[in-house]
A protein has these predicted regions:
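Glycosyltransferase catalytic domains, chiefly GT-A lineage
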Residues: 2-377
Length: 377
C-alpha cells in the first residue's frame, strides 16, 4: 500500500509540472516572445555591462579606432563593430561632490536614452587624474547599469595629454585664459583645439561633452549631425545663448557699428558655446586654413583686430576665428546644447537677453552651465 501511495504522489507531481509547462508556453507565446529572442536580449545586456568591469583594458591608448564609415556616424572596419567616440573632461571629480552629482545626471541620461544597433559600440573617453580615474571606475558600472547598448571605457592621463598639448597651444593661452600668463595646468582646457594633433590618426571623429549635461534624446542621433557638415566645416558647435560675446567684443563693436559681431541670431554672430562639440579630427588634420589659424602670428593678428581678451579657453578661440572664418563651423541647433545659465540677464543685458536665450524646437540636451539646475523630465 505504501508503494502504491508513493507512486500516485509521483504521478501527481509529473502532471502538475506538465500543466505548468503548458501555461508557461502560452504565456510567453501571448507576449510574442520566444526563447531565442529573450536570451539574445540578456546576452546583449550582459555584454554592455561586462565591457566596463575591472578586467577591461582601460589603458590610455585608443584600441578601437576605425576608418570612416559610409554614413559618417561611426567608425568601422568590415566585420568589426562600428564605434562612436565621446570624450569628457574628468579631472578633480574625486574632490568635488558637485561634479560627482553632475556626472551622475549626465551618464544616467546617456544610458536611459541611448540606443545603438547590435554591432555598434559607444566608446567613452575620460581625461582624468589618478584619483578621479579610480572614482570613475567605481561609479560607471552603476551609472550605466541600465544601458541597452555595448560600451567601452578609456581613461586618458591628463598629465600625459597636457605634456603633448602645451607646446601647441602655449601661445594662445594669453589671449583666451584668465590671468596674464600661460599656465601649464590650464593647457588641457584647449584640448579640443589641437586634439587632431595629439590623438592617433585612426581616430577620425569624436564628440566632446561637458560634465553638466542631461540627455533627453539618443546620443547616437548627435553623431548623425556629422553627416550635415558642409564641405569645409571641421567642427560642429552650438551658438552661445547669452550676450557673452556682445560684451567681450564691445570695443570692436564700438569701432565697427555696422558689424554683426556679437549680435544675436539669426543674422548676428553671437559666438559659440563649447558644452557640446563635434570634432571631425580627420577634417581638422587636412584643413590648411584651420592649422594656419593655430600659428601664433595668425592668432595674435586676429586677437589684435578684434581687441579680444577672453577667459573661456577653447570656446573663446573658436568664437574668435569663427568671426573671420564661418565656413570652418557647422552650427548645431540650440536643442543640442540648450544652455540654461541666465547670469548675463541680471548683469547689464536684460533688455537684449531673450534675443540670445530663445530656443525654438525640441530640446535634445540640457546644459546646466554656471551651476544652473536642470529641469526634471
Amino acid at each position: 500500500m505504501g508503494r502504491f501511495s508513493s507512486f500516485r504522489s509521483y504521478q501527481i507531481v509529473l502532471l502538475f509540472a506538465a500543466a505548468l509547462a503548458v501555461v508557461a508556453f502560452y504565456y510567453f507565446g501571448s507576449e510574442k516572445q520566444n526563447f531565442s529572442s529573450t536570451t539574445k536580449r540578456i546576452k546583449e545586456t550582459q555584454v554592455s555591462h561586462n565591457t566596463n568591469r575591472d578586467d577591461a583594458d582601460l589603458s590610455i591608448d585608443i584600441r578601437s579606432g576605425r576608418p570612416e564609415s559610409r554614413t559618417g556616424d561611426g567608425e568601422e572596419l568590415e566585420g568589426k563593430p562600428s564605434r562612436f567616440h565621446a570624450l569628457m573632461m574628468f579631472t578633480k571629480v574625486n574632490k568635488s561632490l558637485n561634479l560627482q552629482q553632475k556626472f551622475r545626471v549626465t551618464m544616467r541620461s546617456v544610458a536611459k536614452h541611448g540606443r545603438f544597433l547590435e554591432d555598434e559600440v559607444l566608446v567613452l573617453h575620460y581625461v582624468s587624474d589618478a584619483g578621479s580615474q579610480e572614482l570613475g571606475k567605481k561609479m560607471l558600472p552603476e551609472l550605466l547599469l541600465g544601458a541597452t547598448f555595448q560600451y567601452e571605457v578609456v581613461f586618458h592621463d591628463v598629465g600625459a595629454l597636457t605634456e603633448k598639448l602645451f607646446p601647441i597651444i602655449e601661445a594662445m593661452q594669453k589671449h583666451f585664459s584668465a590671468g596674464s600668463g600661460t599656465y601649464y595646468s590650464d593647457a588641457i582646457f584647449f584640448l579640443s583645439v589641437a586634439m587632431h594633433r595629439i590623438m592617433p590618426t585612426e581616430l577620425k571623429r569624436i564628440v566632446q561633452l561637458d560634465l553638466d549635461l542631461k540627455f533627453r534624446s539618443n546620443i547616437r542621433d548627435l553623431f548623425q549631425e556629422f553627416n550635415r557638415f558642409p564641405a569645409e566645416a571641421v567642427i560642429g558647435i552650438a551658438h552661445e545663448m547669452q550676450p557673452v560675446y556682445r560684451h567681450t567684443f564691445w570695443q570692436y563693436r564700438k569701432e565697427n557699428p555696422k558689424s554683426h559681431v556679437g549680435d544675436p541670431p539669426p543674422d548676428g554672430l553671437p559666438g559659440f558655446n563649447s558644452g557640446v562639440m563635434l570634432l571631425n579630427l580627420d577634417a581638422m588634420r587636412h584643413s590648411t586654413l584651420y592649422n594656419q589659424l593655430l600659428e601664433p602670428e595668425r592668432m595674435a593678428h586676429l586677437a589684435e583686430k578684434y581687441h579680444f581678451r577672453g577667459h573661456l579657453g577653447d570656446q573663446d578661440f573658436f568664437t574668435m576665428i569663427g568671426m573671420e572664418h564661418r565656413e570652418l563651423f557647422y552650427p548645431l541647433s540650440c536643442g543640442w546644447n540648450r544652455q540654461l545659465c541666465t547670469w548675463w540677464r541680471e548683469h547689464g543685458y536684460g533688455d537684449v537677453f531673450q534675443l540670445y536665450y530663445r530656443c525654438d524646437g525640441p530640446v535634445h540636451i540640457y546644459h546646466g552651465n554656471c551651476n544652473t539646475p536642470i529641469p526634471n523630465d
